[in-house]
Amino acid sequence: MTNYIKRFSILFFIVSSGLFANEGENLKDDIKNEESKDKEVFIEELVEDYEEIPGFFITYRDPKTNKIFLKINQNQLGKEFIYFAHVLDSVVTTGNVRGSYADKGIFKIEKDFENLRFTRVLTNYVFDEESPLKRSKGANTSDSTFKVIPIKGKNKEKNNFLIDITSLLLSESLTPILPIFSPEDFSPSRFAWGQVSPTKSRVLDVHNYEENTDFEVEYVIESAPSYEYDGEDAADPRNVSVHMRYSFIDMPNNDFEPRIENQSIGYFSDRITNLTSKEITPYEDLISKWHLKKQDPEAKFSKPVKPIVFWIENTTPLELRDYIKEGVLAWNIAFKEAGFIDAIEVKIQPDDAEWDAGDIRYNVLRWTSSPDPLFGGYGPRLSNPRTGEILGADIMLEWVYLTNRINYDSIFNAESSPASCHSSNLIQDGIILAENIQLNDPKIIEQSIKRLALHEVGHTLGLNHNFKGSYLHNNEDVHNPDITSKVGVTASVMEYPAINLAPLGVEQGDYYDTTPGPYDIWAIKYGYTPNLTASDLDEIIAEQNRPEHMFANDSEDMRSPGRGVDPRAMINDLTNDPITYAAQRIELINYNQANVVSKLSGNVKTFEEYRLALSIFMREYSRSLEVVSRHIGGVYVERYDPKNLNDKMPYSPAPPEEQRRAMGILHKHAFSTEAFPVNPDLLMRAQVERRMFDLYGEHEDPQIHKTILSIQNRVLDHVLSPWTLYRISDTELYGNDYSVNEVMNDLTKSIFTGDKDNKVSSIRRNLQTAYVRRLIDILGQDYYDELATAAAYNSLREIQKIVRRSSSDVSTKSHRKLVSWIIESGLDRAN
């Protein structure tokens, strides 16, 4: 019994000791928690050693680690802000170049327990406020949360939150930095970019203003060693920097008047669909435009309360500043039609200015000189996705496009992205062409600079390209400066026209537009006239049927073979008879090519000037042929409101007689024995200037056969495109009588007949072989229809008869045997 009592006592002691011990530990924890509450570190203490940068979002920088912190106020939670990213600097191969706009959107910050969530808001859809369907808002759509950041500290009132945004800024959470290529763009020889380095990348600066907070960031892309990077714009391609500037902007709260886009007028717009509308086209896309208000709302014409101010950057060459200023201010002609006097002002950035062009509060015309720029002019704008209000704009201009420096690789690569603006590229080509036909006219530079400024400022006003603007004049009026100086060379400075060179025997007129055209004035009137009623807008839109108001943008143009349908929506053309204009341009080129050696003799400093002359002549020749070719299989497109009377249908075939006339020009200047007259004196002088070992692995001689065949192939790429041939067959059902069979018969006759003395020239031998291979391909490809296949088969049989003809010329005999073999073996494979 005694032992039992002892054991129980010991057990009781142990248990009770443990209980008392646990109670003691809990007591200690409670004391610690109380002390912890008393010692809670608030924002004021956390940032006491940091640099404070006051402004829209109060920002702090840790001077020891360069970490960046934001203080978010309770009132800023759930509110929408505008996000904007643009490139301060990089190398061309990254796809990010100085001044280019990278990204924009709406974002909001929300508190989620002890984290703040950054979410990009979808703005593509709206609902009528009174509709019950509005309750379904957000169904089957998604906002995008791009970052979740822990709260580092709070103030005593718990309504301010401190977060470390360094990882947000140094990652690709905000905007992709690395180039993104589509599968079609993949090439084994393309430089393989690595990843953004989190250790080498850094925040360069913070700029804080009353309505926006900006961050400058340098991203360093680390890549593996590679031979594929052959540019000279990076000291070491293993470590390439991309400098970005991000802006967090307060959502404007003003009386801005949004305007819905009309398909007949080319504005950039923010895409919005009304999900409660019963319309077949429930689109409410909002055009991009500036917030202009009249000082006197009752006056017909009034100065604006706040004009649009453009600053000419202090990097701009002095000799160009007046031309640029005049070009920009010329837009006031159009704004007067909208009721505004001096809507645009131009100022010069002082050399000692404390602000820089990266500050979105300033709209700047900037000049740079880059080694290999993507474009020569670029006019991006930042707009509010909720309203379309333009908040800022810059214009990037490249010095290279006013020089004779030219990228030879691009001579016969005319493919381009609609996202890019190549107006200045064409202006550069025009200047060089004019120089090589010895037009020593100072008016060329003056008018080209004014037009470049007009074009790029047009983009910053919200206008996109208009590739039907070239149809304003006939072939006589376009060379009459009494007419063109008043209304322009084209209907729109947003065109990509050919330089207006007078044909042989005609006195030279204006080279380029120096004033907004009638389309531009109409577009500004629609977009900027304040306080318009629905009937007022309808009245303006009703002018869409005027020929000077024709419009087509980049999605409709025919610059690339097989793309687009309306031959009037084309680049490098001019006048309402572009076929004749192009033929006259080719005759002008042929004349000057024959005489260029004697003209340049004694004035050249390097034989590369002859090379440049040859290249620009051949490029202009190619462009003229492409303009002509687009009329074959063309369909005229008219876009108008059905309630506005119009005697034209939305779709009508290009007149068959115009298509046949175009084929006749192609026969003469692309395929016949007369095409491509070669100047041997020019070829012998067209030498590339050697630079160190750059000629290693290159064929430096002017490969004229290859060049000519590439031009001919670009014409055939279009005429024999499956889309062109489909369209020819389809339009036979509604007015076209120029059939696929007739088109191919005309091509075959042009390419295979007419050789002098039954001797086929080397240029024509190349062409004939390439053409036959194309016809064989048509037989073997599923994407050609049976109508095209039958026409191709018939042409091959006709060619077989032609090549059986005897010839005393050895080269012709060999060539015809080859062609015969290609046809026989090709037909065997196609069976």
Predicted feature residues:
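Sec-exported extracytoplasmic/periplasmic mature domains
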Residues: 329-340, 458-459, 463, 499, ...
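The catalytic-center signature of Zn2+-dependent metalloproteases
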Residues: 348-370, 374, 447-503
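Conserved catalytic/binding loops enriched for acidic/polar residues
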Residues: 444, 470-831
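Extended catalytic-interface subdomain
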Residues: 389-407, 453, 457-458, 503-504, ...
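Bacterial N-terminal signal peptides that target proteins for export
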Residues: 1-9
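Divalent metal-coordination and catalytic microenvironments
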Residues: 70, 331, 388, 455, ...
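Auxiliary tRNA-acceptor-end handling modules of aminoacyl-tRNA synthetases
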Residues: 25-316, 334, 338, 349-440, ...
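Hydrophobic h-region of N-terminal signal peptides that target proteins for export
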Residues: 12-21
